[in-house]
A protein has these predicted regions:
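Helix-terminus/linker motif at the lipid-water interface of multi-pass membrane proteins
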Residues: 30-49, 118-125, 181-188, 247-280, ...
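Small-residue-rich hydrophobic transmembrane alpha-helices
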Residues: 48-108, 145-164, 257, 270-328, ...
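Hydrophobic residues within alpha-helical transmembrane segments
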Residues: 19, 23, 54-57, 97-101, ...
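Small-residue hotspots at the loop-to-helix junctions and early N-terminal turns
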Residues: 43-56, 135, 194, 265-280, ...
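Short alpha-helical transmembrane segments in multi-pass integral membrane proteins
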Residues: 1-18, 76-141, 185-240, 296-361, ...
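Transmembrane helical elements of multi-pass membrane transporters/channels
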Residues: 16-32, 137, 171, 200-204, ...
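Signature of the first transmembrane helix
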Residues: 12-73, 77, 240-260
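Short runs within selected transmembrane alpha-helices of multi-pass transporters and secretion channels
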Residues: 138-156, 164-172, 193-206, 286-289, ...
């Protein structure tokens, strides 16, 4: 299961590691999109809006958990790179202790706050009840969602990106089947979507734990589960900035959703659908971020920083190539693509406008995501937090607000606001990268 990524062709390692990661993201995004697609076939705009708003809240929570788990991926990868198996086991054990404790706390806190969350999201009145149902069920399933994601992060830190792909495939198939049963046969609406998502992840967790136990894929002693200050500090030092970074990104999306919600039900539904589509189109940038983090960390742990930099270069080039192709294609198929998720023609038109602007973000994000992965691999995840925070505060949110105010007839400028934020992030990343290289050069010469 453990794989050494510090030898051989860097490009080959990037491709071989990122492909299973890409397929994992594809499957995960597929079952996220399935909720919207299936409910759109059986329910009206209000239910579609409820699922889009509820799933956005859950997506925000999930990406923050995954961001926090980056500390585990990098710590395990660095230990694997230097051949320190005991350190890797300690990192795995402390990761389990930290995240399962956190999941229990989140379960109770979020259940208490679910009404306030729906209010803060400026949920249209017609969608309030469905959104509450969706969030209540998903919050109850938080321990499964957490376990589902940390198991994947542990495997990837060990250099294994294939096992998580298999576990996610199980969740995807189960989710789609349950969605049709709960929403199509039983007509449970948004509650059915939440049940399908939560139960499918629970099934995936149970199966993954059974496989791990049967094949003894991970060796963790009881002592490894005891909190160790030095291990916890490293997990949190890397993970917290990434979690905050991802949280701020999602907050900016939530604010944009709130702005769209205040424009009416049509624009609210359009933005919700496009967010799901963008999640699919961001598969390459997202997989490159995680690939650079894992491969870069192993090589840095092995004392081969030049291979980590080469990993960054190849990842950015691959992401840019795919991003350019997506930008070109979407200009011709944006409206029909949105129309697959709704029978409402007005929603399809508005969504097409938003997507044509937003899609530029997939090109720019490919570069800044690769940089973020590199900074995490170096243990400098604070830089990733900084450039995302600045882009949100200075570009994304103000840009979306001004676009909504001065262009009330179209969502195109709002989409461009997000892309502008990523372009700004690239500028900050390039400056930070140059400073890091200069300091490393001086350290070698001095």
């Amino acid at each position: 299961m453990e794989k050494n990524l510090t030898q051989g062709s860097v490009l080959k390692n990037v491709v071989s590691f990122s492909l299973p990661y890409l397929l994992s993201y594809f499957l995960q995004t597929l079952y996220g999109m399935a909720d919207l697609f299936i409910i759109g076939q059986f329910e009206g705009v209000a239910s579609t809006t409820a699922v889009s708003i509820g799933s956005q809240v859950m997506h925000m929570l999930t990406v923050m958990l995954v961001g926090l788990a980056m500390g585990a991926t990098v710590s395990i990868a660095q230990a694997t790179g230097r051949g320190a198996k005991k350190d890797a086991s300690a990192a795995i054990g402390n990761t389990v202790t930290l995240f399962m404790s956190l999941s229990v706390v989140l379960l109770f806190v979020l259940l208490v706050l679910r009404g306030s969350i729906v209010s803060v999201m400026s949920t249209p009145e017609e969608a309030v009840s469905g959104t509450l149902d969706y969030l209540t069920i998903c919050f109850i399933g938080i321990p499964f969602i957490t376990a589902y994601n940390i198991i994947a992060s542990i495997f990837r830190g060990l250099g294994d990106s294939k096992s998580p792909m298999y576990f996610i495939a199980v969740a995807c198939v189960v989710n789609i089947a349950l969605d049709y049963y709960f929403m199509g046969t039983l007509r449970l609406g948004p509650a059915g979507a939440a049940l399908g998502t939560t139960l499918s992840q629970a099934v995936s967790v149970v199966i993954s734990l059974a496989v791990i136990r049967k094949k003894q894929l991970i060796a963790v002693r009881r002592a490894d589960l005891r909190p160790c200050r030095s291990v916890m500090e490293k997990l949190l030092k890397i993970g917290v900035p990434v979690a905050l970074q991802d949280g701020f990104i999602q907050v900016s999306f939530v604010i944009i959703t709130i702005i769209a919600n205040r424009r009416g039900l049509t624009d609210a539904a359009a933005v919700g659908i496009v967010e799901k589509i963008i999640g699919f189109l961001f598969l390459i940038p997202s997989s490159m971020l995680s690939t650079v983090s894992a491969l870069g960390a192993q090589n840095i742990g092995a004392g081969k920083p030049e291979r980590a930099r080469l990993t960054l270069r190849y990842a950015a080039m691959i992401a840019c190539a795919f991003g350019a192709a997506e930008v070109l294609l979407i200009q011709f198929i944006a409206e029909p693509l949105v129309g697959l998720f709704t029978p409402d023609a007005a929603v399809a038109v508005a969504g097409g406008q938003y997507l044509c602007g937003y899609i530029w973000d997939s090109f720019f994000a490919g570069v800044q995501f690769s940089f973020s992965g590199y900074f995490c691999a170096c243990g400098k995840s604070g830089i990733s937090f900084l450039h995302n925070f600045l882009s949100i505060v200075l570009i994304r949110v103000p840009g979306a607000y001004l676009a909504s105010r001065y262009f009330p007839q179209t969502l195109l400028p709002m989409g461009l606001a997000s892309a502008s934020g990523s372009l700004f992030s690239i500028l900050v990343c390039v400056i930070a990268y140059a400073i890091i290289l200069r300091r490393e050069r001086r350290a070698r010469e001095g």
